[in-house]
C-alpha cells in the first residue's frame, strides 16, 4: 500500500476553510502530567501549515487511553494536552468539554479567524470505537444509528478533513473513516510515515535487517512471517526469544515468558527463514532476575546453562549484544520493532541501549534506520536518539500492521487523486 494515489495536505487549498483534523495525541501521562510529548510535537507542522495558509480554524480531535466509551475526565481528559499544545504552538488553544453535539457544533460553526480548537477525548463516546463498556464494566456495542449521528456531528466541525493520526490508522473508528467531507487529506506526519514504510517494504536497501523484540510470539507471528519475505537478516530478542529457544534448543527458561500458542508455529517460521535464505540471530546469554521487579536480585545465564526455576530472563547478556551489534554493522537498512529487554529498568536496559548505540552509529554511516513505534520509540525518547535515526514512527500498532502487510483503514478512507 503506498500513498502515491492519496490526497495530501500540500495539495489542498485551506484558505478561509475550517479544517477538522484527526491527530494522535494519545500521550503517556503520570499524575496528569505528560511524560513524553513526541506525538503532540509531531503534529505541529501540519497544524501550522493550515494556519500559515489562512485556514479559518483548525479543530483537533483525538483519543486518549481506553475509557471504553465512558466519560472519565478525571483520568483521560485532554486538558493537560491543551496546555502543552498552547506552549508548542505559541498561540491560544480553546479546549471544549466534549467532541460532538450542539454546543461543540456551535463553537466550531463560525470561530474567529485562525482559531485552534481542541475537542475532548473521542473515546468518551462508545460511538467512536463502535464498542465499549457500560458503567458496570459489561461489554456493549454501539447503536448503528447513534454511530451515524456521531459521525455526522464530527463532519459538521470542518469543511476539509485532514488525518495526521498514523498511530490509529489501523483502526476503522468513526473519526478515522466516518468524517464525510469532500476532501479528505493526509497530513504531513501521515505522509512521512507512509513514504518511509513504503520505501522500506517495496524497494529496500540491502542487506535489510529486521530487529524484532517484545513479549509474545503470537502477537508477532504475522510480522515475523511477512518480514521473512522481505529481509536478509533478522534478530529475534526480548521476551519472545525464550519461546524460540525453548522449542529449538530445549532450553530451561525458568519463569521467563513462554508463549504456549506461539510455540506451535516456531518451527514453521524457522523453516520459512531457511527456505528464504534469511539468517536469524537469537540471544545466547541473559541477565536474569529472581522476580519481575526493578530492584530484583540479578544473575547471568546462557542458553546452555539454562535459567533456574523461580528466575527469569529480563535482558540479553554481553555475548548476545556482541552478536547483535555485528549483525547491525552489516545492514544497509533496518526496521526495529520491540526492545530486547526490560529497558524501563536500568538493571535490564543494557542490551537495548547497546543495540540503540550501534543503530545510531550505522545511521551516521548511511544506513536507513526505521524505529517502529510503541516501546521502541519510547527507547529513543529515553536515550535522546529520536533525531539520530532515520525515522521514528509515531504508531506502534499501525506500523506493526503495515509491516505485517495489511491495508490500514484510516489510509484507505482518504480521498484518491
UniProtKB/Swiss-Prot annotation:
Q: Please provide the record's keywords in A-Z order.
A: ATP-binding, Cytoplasm, Glycolysis, Kinase, Magnesium, Metal-binding, Nucleotide-binding, Transferase
Q: Which residues bind ATP?
A: 215, 220, 239, 313, 344, 375-376
Instruction: State where (2R)-3-phosphoglycerate binds.
Output: 23-26, 38-39, 62-63, 65-66, 122-123, 170-171
| Stored InterPro entries | Phosphoglycerate_kinase, Phosphoglycerate_kinase_CS, Phosphoglycerate_kinase_N, Phosphoglycerate_kinase_sf
GO CC annotation = chromosome; cytosol
Which stretch is the leader sequence?
none
Cofactor field: Mg(2+)
Q: CDD domains from the entry?
A: Phosphoglycerate_kinase
Where, in this chain's numbering, is ADP bound?
214, 238, 343
Catalytic function, reaction form: (2R)-3-phosphoglycerate + ATP = (2R)-3-phospho-glyceroyl phosphate + ADP
Residues annotated for AMP binding in this entry: 215-216, 220, 239, 313, 344
Entry EC no(s)? 2.7.2.3
User: Gene encoding this chain?
Assistant: PGK
Q: Which organism's genome codes for this protein?
A: Gallus gallus (Chicken)
- Spell out the protein name for this chain: Phosphoglycerate kinase
In Gene Ontology terms, what is one molecular function of this protein?
ADP binding
Subunit and partners: Monomer.
| Annotated PANTHER family | PHOSPHOGLYCERATE KINASE (PTHR11406:SF0)
Pathway field of the UniProt record reads: Carbohydrate degradation; glycolysis; pyruvate from D-glyceraldehyde 3-phosphate: step 2/5
Top EC class per UniProt? transferase
Q: Which GO terms describe its biological process?
A: gluconeogenesis; glycolytic process
UniProt-annotated location(s): Cytoplasm
- Summary of the function given for this chain in its UniProt record: Catalyzes one of the two ATP producing reactions in the glycolytic pathway via the reversible conversion of 1,3-diphosphoglycerate to 3-phosphoglycerate. In addition to its role as a glycolytic enzyme, it seems that PGK-1 acts as a polymerase alpha cofactor protein (primer recognition protein). May play a role in sperm motility.
Family stated for the protein in its record: Belongs to the phosphoglycerate kinase family.
Main site of residence?
Answer: cytoplasm
Amino acid at each position: 500500500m503506498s500513498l502515491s494515489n492519496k490526497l495530501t495536505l500540500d495539495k489542498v487549498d485551506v484558505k478561509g476553510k475550517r479544517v477538522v483534523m484527526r491527530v494522535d495525541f494519545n500521550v503517556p501521562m503520570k499524575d496528569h502530567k505528560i511524560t513524553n510529548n513526541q506525538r503532540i510535537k509531531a503534529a505541529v507542522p501540519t497544524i501550522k501549515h493550515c494556519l500559515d495558509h489562512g485556514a479559518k480554524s483548525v479543530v483537533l480531535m483525538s483519543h486518549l487511553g481506553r475509557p471504553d466509551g465512558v466519560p472519565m475526565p478525571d483520568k483521560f481528559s485532554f486538558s493537560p494536552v491543551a496546555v502543552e499544545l498552547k506552549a508548542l504552538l505559541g498561540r491560544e488553544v480553546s479546549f471544549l468539554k466534549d467532541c460532538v453535539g450542539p454546543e461543540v457544533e456551535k463553537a466550531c460553526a463560525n470561530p474567529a479567524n485562525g482559531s485552534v480548537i481542541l475537542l475532548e477525548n473521542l473515546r468518551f463516546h462508545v460511538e467512536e470505537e463502535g464498542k465499549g463498556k457500560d458503567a458496570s464494566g459489561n461489554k456493549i456495542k454501539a447503536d448503528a444509528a447513534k454511530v451515524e449521528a456521531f459521525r455526522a456531528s464530527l463532519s459538521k466541525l470542518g469543511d476539509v478533513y485532514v488525518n495526521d493520526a498514523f498511530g490509529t490508522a489501523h483502526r476503522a473508528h468513526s473519526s478515522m473513516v466516518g468524517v464525510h467531507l469532500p476532501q479528505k487529506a493526509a497530513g504531513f506526519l501521515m505522509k512521512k510515515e507512509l513514504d518511509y514504510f513504503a520505501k522500506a517494504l517495496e524497494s529496500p536497501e540491502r542487506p535489510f535487517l529486521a530487529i524484532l523484540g517484545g513479549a509474545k510470539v503470537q502477537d508477532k507471528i504475522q510480522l515475523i512471517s511477512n518480514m521473512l519475505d522481505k529481509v536478509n537478516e533478522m534478530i529475534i530478542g526480548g521476551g519472545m526469544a525464550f519461546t524460540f529457544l525453548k522449542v529449538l534448543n530445549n532450553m530451561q527458561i525458568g519463569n521467563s515468558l513462554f508463549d504456549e500458542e506461539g510455540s506451535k508455529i516456531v518451527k514453521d517460521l524457522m523453516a520459512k527463514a531457511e527456505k528464504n535464505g534469511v539468517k536469524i540471530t537469537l540471544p545466547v546469554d541473559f541477565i536474569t532476575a529472581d522476580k519481575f521487579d526493578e530492584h530484583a536480585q540479578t544473575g547471568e545465564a546462557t542458553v546452555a546453562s539454562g535459567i533456574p526455576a523461580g528466575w527469569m530472563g529480563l535482558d540479553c547478556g554481553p555475548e548476545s549484544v556482541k552478536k547483535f551489534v555485528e549483525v547491525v554493522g552489516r545492514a544497509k537498512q533496518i526496521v526495529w520493532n520491540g526492545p530486547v529487554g526490560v529497558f524501563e529498568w536500568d538493571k535490564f536496559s543494557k542490551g537495548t541501549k547497546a543495540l540503540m548505540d550501534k543503530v545510531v552509529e550505522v545511521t551516521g554511516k548511511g544506513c536507513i534506520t526505521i524505529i517502529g513505534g510503541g516501546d521502541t520509540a519510547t527507547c529513543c525518547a529515553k536515550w535522546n536518539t529520536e533525531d539520530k535515526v532515520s525515522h521514528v514512527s509515531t504508531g506502534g500498532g499501525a506500523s506493526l500492521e503495515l509491516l505485517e502487510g495489511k491495508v490500514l483503514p484510516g489510509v484507505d478512507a482518504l480521498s484518491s487523486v
